[in-house]
Amino acid sequence: MEKKKLIRVTTHDISLNGLLEGQLKFLNQYYDVIGLAKDTGELDTVRQREGIHCIDVPMEREISLRKDVKALYILYKLFRKEKPWMVHSNTPKGSLLSMIAAWAARVPRRVYLVTGLRYQGAHGLLRTILKTMERITCSFATNVIPEGQGVLHTLQADHITAKPLKVIHYGNINGKDTKHLSRRQTVADNLHISPDTVTDNDMAEYRQTVRRQLGFTDDDFVFIFIGRIVTDKGMTELSRAMKTLSDRHPNVRLLLVGTMEKGDAIADDVHDYLLNSKNVKYVGSQTDVRPFLMAADALVFPSYREGFPNVPMEAGAMDLPCIVTDINGSNEIIRDGLNGKIIEAPLDGHGRHVHDITPALTKTMEWFIFHPAEVSRMSRNARRMIKERYEQRDVWNGLLAFYRSLE
């Protein structure tokens, strides 16, 4: 029996490559999967790793009427040619264009997976435009999937769509491979030995080695942040908290993993502090964050807004408790007092900055320093809570069951 054709769309190939790793190969067992995105150099990686056909479509993330109309026409022609049973999209611009084009091409099933809602951090006219884009995308979709319960509630509260909404499994776009995201596997991969032979002593020695290479001592309490080093990830508040804590606790350290971007760039004084403070170690972007998570004692993730963030899940799978803000996704992954701590969110429902979270962040980070037994208890809970809810295979099977319900 011929397999139904399924087209998965993201705006750029970096999302197709990073967000959907392994999932497309899994789905290709049951459907004829095509990946569609703008090729910025990673589309061939997707093609080879996932074993699927990929098509380059010149879509841009930012609003550009001429380029958007051109991309819309290309998508329409592609869908008319390929005649897919379903077009399933995520990322804002790719979703907007592909849902309209799929509707015009009479694709039977048009699925929009809503991850982050960009308008939540915007104001004025831009906020209105971004909300309108979400409404249009949802209106042209036959099915809308919120990535988590927080996104679901926001879509309803902001009257983005009246369509029925249901989160797949416990949420998240791709789940986590907890076999790969484990201390034992990390040591095995880096020492080139079988994970079955890795002992607790091997893991302790490896952690100590990585800490030493990063300039940390056994007495240091190391917080780690992973992500874009930008304002809406809470970098201003995190730098202020670290300044205060460094005066009180000379052995507190911050390990920063990620890129410093020009868009939403941090202020000069924050930039200088994060690069020059002896209490901060900046290592830039890393292809494998597992050794850095092993070197840390806790994740700090004071983001302003998310859809369903991957970093707290990765940290949890690596046995780290987390400090997060009370925002979509983060407050689903973390259960306050069980596998981390939740502090107030800086933005209200209209994207206005209503709370300076610096005092709460400082207080909570200091609580971690003062309560090693509680931190250890939350650490023991962390991995189990990720495995129970976000194991990758469970997320994939949940998505497959959703697809089959539409056949």
Where are the regions a protein language model picked out?
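N-terminal strand-loop element at the rim of the active site
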Residues: 8-67, 154-158, 165-167
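A conserved mid-protein helix/loop that constitutes part of the nucleotide-sugar donor-binding site
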Residues: 17-22, 221-244
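Short, structured helix-loop element that forms part of the nucleotide-activated donor/catalytic region
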Residues: 43-48, 253-279, 283, 374
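Donor nucleotide-sugar binding/catalytic pocket of nucleotide-sugar-dependent glycosyltransferases
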Residues: 55-56, 135, 139-207
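Short His-centered aromatic/hydrophobic patch
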Residues: 89-95
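A short, well-ordered alpha-helix in the C-terminal region of glycosyltransferases
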Residues: 209-212, 367, 374-389, 395-400
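Aromatic "clamp/platform" in nucleotide-sugar-dependent glycosyltransferases that forms part
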Residues: 285, 304
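Short hydrophobic beta-strand element within catalytic cores of glycosyltransferases
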Residues: 321-324, 334, 342
